[in-house]
């Protein structure tokens, strides 16, 4: 049985999240980083694990963070984010939609608290849809996501180089699983 945060607490987290992401979005260099093209939303669906993130107040002390994306018949996406906090699995649900319906651009709008939406921009996606980098409207938000709970040091280094090139504060990244597998190069 899942333990859930009280609804009003989830709504508070979502409202803060949306306000922060939209606060200075139009002036952010993150808007200059293009989303991936030739994006296949069906292939993106399923479970993703959070490998790294910039710190923010709605995921404080959250570990084992993961997201499950489920495409609906109307083209919207059901989002279920979950993670461990104080040894309890918590979850937050949202709905997402394409910014440009029918396009192959990796850019979605996500609402944890209707009618407010925030940007979910996929700025890197490997060809097998197993490793992704996602941002919002500002340089304060970025996530490295993987289909696997652990990634290789090479994969992490590649992501960090891209983030650094784009101007993200990689020294501030948090690694909520603490699991990074080293492999021979």
Per-range role (PLM):
Residues 14-18:
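Hydrophobic helical h-region of N-terminal Sec-dependent signal peptides
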Residues 5, 10, 20-185:
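A beta-rich soluble binding module of mature secreted/lumenal proteins
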